[in-house]
Design a protein with these regions (language model features):
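Intrinsic disorder/low-complexity signal
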Residues: 1-2, 19, 34, 77, ...
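Short, low-complexity N-terminal intrinsically disordered segments enriched in polar/charged residues
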Residues: 1-29, 130-139
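Hydrophobic pocket/interface hotspot
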Residues: 11, 23-24, 31, 43, ...
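Alpha-helix C-capping/helix-to-loop hinge sites
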Residues: 11-14, 34, 83
């Protein structure tokens, strides 16, 4: 479990430092990586390409780990994330990562889930829900 937590911490630190500190060692050659909003990458080389390209367009400001859960070969990480894109857009949200590890200790599957920070009770004013005018975000 400790090795898996180190692997996740390494992955997050790569984003914070904008530096490949061993993507090909961290992810298996056949790894599948699913972002919460739709993109899917196949293989460590594809993940490395995405990492390098994304970091030309933005900066991860925070990726704080809140807690880990472990079961079998899987690890779940709860986190807080913040970025700033070069075009002025910024994102702040909470999320979770489900990661599976192979027999070599490499990540062979990773799926991210995001959660909007702007939460509210649509029934606080009565039986008819009042939903926010904010456009739904899919993290």
């Amino acid at each position: 479990m400790d090795e898996r937590e180190k692997a996740v911490r390494l992955w997050f630190s790569m984003w914070l430092e904008k530096k490949d500190l061993g993507i090909r060692r961290l992810f298996s050659p056949n790894c599948v990586y699913v972002e919460s909003w739709g993109p899917e990458y196949h293989g460590a080389e594809s993940i490395r390409l995405w990492f390098e390209e994304w970091n030309t367009r933005g900066t991860v400001l925070k990726w704080d780990i809140r807690q880990f859960f472990h079961k079998g070969n899987q690890t779940v990480v709860e986190w807080f994330f913040q970025n700033q894109m070069n075009d002025g857009r910024a994102e702040v949200f909470e999320g979770m990562t489900l990661a599976a590890f192979d027999a070599n200790g490499q990540i062979c599957f990773l799926k991210e889930f995001g959660c909007n920070l702007n939460r509210y009770n649509p029934y606080c004013g009565g039986l008819k829900p009042q939903f926010s005018n904010e456009q739904a975000r899919w993290f």
